Amino acid sequence: MQESRSKESTLSGDEDKDVHRFLDEFDDKCTCKLLKEMKETLEGLKKSHPNPTNLDEFYRLFERYLRTRHEKIVWEKIRSPKDRIVQYNEIPEPTEKSKELLRKLAILKLNGGLGTTMGCVGPKSAITIKDGKNFIDLVVKQIRYLNSKYKIDVPLILMNSFNTEGMTDKIIFRYDGIKKFSQSKFPRISSETLLPVSPSHGDKGMYPPGHGDLFYSMKNSGMLEELLEGGYEYLFVSNIDNLASTVDLKLLEYFATNELGFLMEVTDKTRADVKGGTLIEYKGALRLLEIAQVPSNKKSEFTSFKKFTIFNTNNLWINLKEMKKKLEEGFFDLDIIENKKALDDETVIQLETAIGSAIKYFPNSCGVVVPRSRFLPVKTCSDLFLVESNLFVEKNGTLQLHPSRVPETCPTVKLIGENFSKIEKYEKCFKGIPDILELEVLTVSGNVLFGKNVVLKGTVIILADEKSKICVPDGSVLEDNIIYGNLPIIDH
């Protein structure tokens, strides 16, 4: 009887093919119906959209998403890209030629992000970092120093988003010569219907689609053509919150001399970077692999140090002529990242792309393993604590490790809990940022308040019990201390 059931439930090879063919045809019909609904909805949204052609680009992205969303990377086909990875210290020192190449260079800072993870209501670039200066102020200072030193005029370009352009304009009005354009404005889609959320959400129902949008937006805004007509051939791109991403003549000359189309700066992975994208060789091409593309059963392997030892800093060098050529050929179908967000009580999807994934379209591309000193992002209040401290000194707009710091690495800082997750609460925890020149490890959790002129050395762990408070008095020196429990300060 058991054998009979088994035979009844087994399909022949032809029957199995028929089932798959039926499912594929059904899926195609559903996709076509959904695409038709999407097109009709987008036509309605065009009436109120500031740049209706953005929605045509979104439709193309959405169609590609539907066609490819079930495709998975074949883990076994991933190879080490060691033949395409160059060590920074193996690159020749720059010659006089590099100074001439500067005349063909433009600098672009990615400025589309809000500091929402840190509780900011405006662009992250507006956060004050050193001596009353924010990210934009410091970047402008960097460029002015570069231009003054070499008697040139390297332009600064900001790629804003609809979220950041208003406040950014209020910051840059006092600076001359900054070029700018805004990236696309795409509709968020419902995770249930896969159609745009209600227009009643206003701008909350829209989003900037990641920095991979740079290629389309540079072309669409006219910025690409403007740069090429101005004689610029090379573009250095980086995140505006990475104040260590300055122009490096050594990299510029290497990029130009080797006639590369795309160069990605990578650096050695630490425990703080386990989720960062990495370079791989896949199907004969150099590819950026992001954690969102990794199968769930392989994520632990991805975040380990054994197989993937480097990660993407998002400091990128791009040949503008090559970029234009690829755009004219219709390339840059970048890997799509499905980013789920909460909008009121609804789960929505943002279809995003990463600029680094364009590397696969440039056969003449490579990764360069640069020193960690070229990567100093501010993603959390723990990062902000480091750059605000005396660990870094500002020189010509760049943050550099204090010369007295030994070893020449950053301490490990973990500020844990709701008091340190948002800037407003974080700032209330410090009367002054402690001296951390001799700090190795700092972990702070709970309701902890720091007084003025505090010095932290070695390993310091401060853990406040739930519903209790620890106050570190003015002038305290903590060295290799563990403090826990409840320690209020009583004024006398």
Curated annotation (Swiss-Prot):
Residue span of region Oligomerization: 441-492
Classification via Pfam families: UDPGP
GO molecular function, one term: metal ion binding
One of the GO BP terms on file: UDP-alpha-D-glucose metabolic process
Keywords: Magnesium, Metal-binding, Nucleotidyltransferase, Transferase
Catalytic residues of the enzyme: K379
InterPro entries: Nucleotide-diphossugar_trans, UDPGP_fam, UDPGP_trans
UniProt function note: Plays a central role as a glucosyl donor in cellular metabolic pathways.
UniProt protein name: UTP--glucose-1-phosphate uridylyltransferase
Annotated organism of origin: Encephalitozoon cuniculi (strain GB-M1) (Microsporidian parasite)
